[in-house]
C-alpha cells in the first residue's frame, strides 16, 4: 500500500476535535478512495469525525472526492430524478423508493435510481430487483439505453463506486454509522439534479439539502420521518416528517403530516418487510392494485417526488399547498390503477434480459 503523506496531518487535526474545511475533507477522502490510507488510521479518522460530529464542510468535501472517483453514466435526460434513502434506520420496511421509481416511470418521469443491497433492512433495492428479474449491470451502454428508452434505470452502487471497496472492511468492523452512510445518495452516477432523499437522522436534512444545492442540484427534498419505533429515511404515515428543500437556489424547511396528502395514519409496523422474495411479492401486489399502508406510503413519497421532478408544484412560499399535494397523490395513484407503473416494471424486466448483463451473477 502507498500511504498518503497528506492524510496523517488531517487525521491528527480530526483527533484533536478540530473540524476540517471542505478542501481538507476532500483531500482526506481522495486518499481514502485511492486506497492510500492504513485501515487503523481510517478507523481512527472516521471515529474522530463521528465523536465530534461531522460538519457541512466535511460532508461537501467528501462528496466531491467520491464523485471524482465514481463511474459516471453519460448522456442522462434532462429532468431525471433519483429517489433513495441512506438506509440505516433499522426499521426493516418494505421497499418504498423502489416502488416509487416504477410509479414515476409510469408517468413519464425519467428515473435514475441509485441503490444497494440491504444494510439495515431485510432487503435492499438490488436484492428485490434481482428477484423481480432486473439484475444489476456495469454495462454503461446498456444502462444508458434503459434510461433513454424505458425512462428508468437502476444503478447499483458497487458498479459505479469501486473505490468504496477501500473503506468497506473498516466500515463493517466499526459497526456504527459514519459519514460514508450519507455519501451514496449524494453521489448518484447519473449526476441527476432532482432528488428525493431520505436520511437516517433528522439533523442531516438541512446540511444534505444545502450541500446538494451548493454542488449544482436544482430541486431537492431531504426527508426524515417519525415513527413509533424511531426515525425513518422516508416520508411516513406513522407521524410527522421533517423536510428540508432546495429549490430556486433557496433552502427552506417544513413538516408534512399524512392527512395533508389525504392519507390515513398508520404505524410503521404496517409496512414491515421480510426477505427479498417477500418484499418483491408485496411490490408486485402493490402495482397490481393492492391497497393498504404500503400503497399509501408509496403514494405519499411519489407525490413528493413528482413535485421535485417539476410535475406538480405542492409548495408555495415554503408552505405545503394541500389541494396540490392531494392532486399529486392522485397522479401517483393513477399510475398504479391504470397499470402504468406495472408496465414500467415489465419494460425494465424486458430490457434487463434483451442483452444479458455482464455481471448478473455478481453479488
Swiss-Prot record:
Pathway-wise, it operates in:
Amino-acid biosynthesis; L-tryptophan biosynthesis; L-tryptophan from chorismate: step 2/5
Residues engaged in binding 5-phospho-alpha-D-ribose 1-diphosphate? 85, 88-89, 93, 95-98, 113-121, 125
Q: Which reaction does it catalyse?
A: N-(5-phospho-beta-D-ribosyl)anthranilate + diphosphate = 5-phospho-alpha-D-ribose 1-diphosphate + anthranilate
State the Gene Ontology terms under molecular function.
Answer: anthranilate phosphoribosyltransferase activity; magnesium ion binding
Q: Where does Mg(2+) 2 bind?
A: 233-234
Q: How is the cofactor bound?
A: Binds 2 magnesium ions per monomer.
On whether Amino-acid biosynthesis is a keyword of this UniProt record, the answer is yes
List of residues binding anthranilate 2: 171
> What cofactors does this protein use?
Mg(2+)
* InterPro entries per UniProt: Anthranilate_Pribosyl_Tfrase (IPR005940), Glycosyl_Trfase_fam3 (IPR000312), Glycosyl_Trfase_fam3_N_dom (IPR017459), Glycosyl_Trfase_fam3_N_dom_sf (IPR036320), Nuc_phospho_transferase (IPR035902)
Q: Which GO terms describe its cellular component?
A: cytosol
Instruction: Please state what class of enzyme this protein is.
Output: transferase
Q: Which GO terms describe its biological process?
A: L-tryptophan biosynthetic process
Pfam families, alphabetized: Glycos_trans_3N, Glycos_transf_3
PANTHER family, from UniProt? Answer: ANTHRANILATE PHOSPHORIBOSYLTRANSFERASE
**Subunit structure, per the record?**
Homodimer.
Q: What does this protein do?
A: Catalyzes the transfer of the phosphoribosyl group of 5-phosphorylribose-1-pyrophosphate (PRPP) to anthranilate to yield N-(5'-phosphoribosyl)-anthranilate (PRA).
The Swiss-Prot or TrEMBL record describes its family as follows: Belongs to the anthranilate phosphoribosyltransferase family.
Protein name (database record): Anthranilate phosphoribosyltransferase
